[in-house]
Amino acid sequence: AYGPFDPAGEARRNMALAVDQQRLSNRRAMLDGIDTLRRDIDRKGLMEGLDSFEQQAFNLILSRSQQAFDLKFEDPRVVDRYGKGLGEQMLMARRLCEAGAGFVTINYGGWDMHSGIKQAMDQRGPEVDRAVAALIEDLDQRGMLENTLLVISGEFGRTPKINGSGGRDHWAPLSTLALAGGGLRMGQVVGESAEKVDVPKTRPITPQDLLATIFHVLDFDRRVQFTNQSGRPTYMIENGRPIEELV
């Protein structure tokens, strides 16, 4: 399992320093004193493990990643290029990557368009186009695109036909996603839908294949094993293979 960071999520509040530097220093000195006493009691090495987590916590709230959330440190022209809403989240994601974050997730809801899809897409579409284009261009200009993989995906596709309410319902057999950067071969469309836009026309590309492609970019062994909740060994990715057109 992984714990992606959502730049617009609740965890952001826990990363902000709520006291001044002097009070933080005083608290840290008190904690060091308590830890010294605890080490005298505990000789089994448990405290050494806790120390590393405490240090990570201090590093998190004091590191330059904090500035990643404050767009006043960004060039106003860049902020304007990204736009509001999703654009602000995309920009914070880029700044987090620059600050050392290895995995950032942005959740952008509002796509469950069972009715009124035309009006909803007229609002949603341009915002996504602007933010995504700005991020890709920005990463490229900063020399970060080759080492950063952008994955844009939903949970599933939508029905090929418009329903009676002017919307589209859930549709699992076919979906569309986009990838950019990460050293993959860009500028192409992979896969094709059948005539009725309901199933893949040629070979299907599965979620496991997508994960295998991401693992390839990250140079992770997709065949690594772990023990599942039933206590049985299983592969991280059971059947997926990297998408050959991209790697």
Model-found features: residue ranges?
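Ligand-binding pockets and gating/stacking loops
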Residues: 1-247
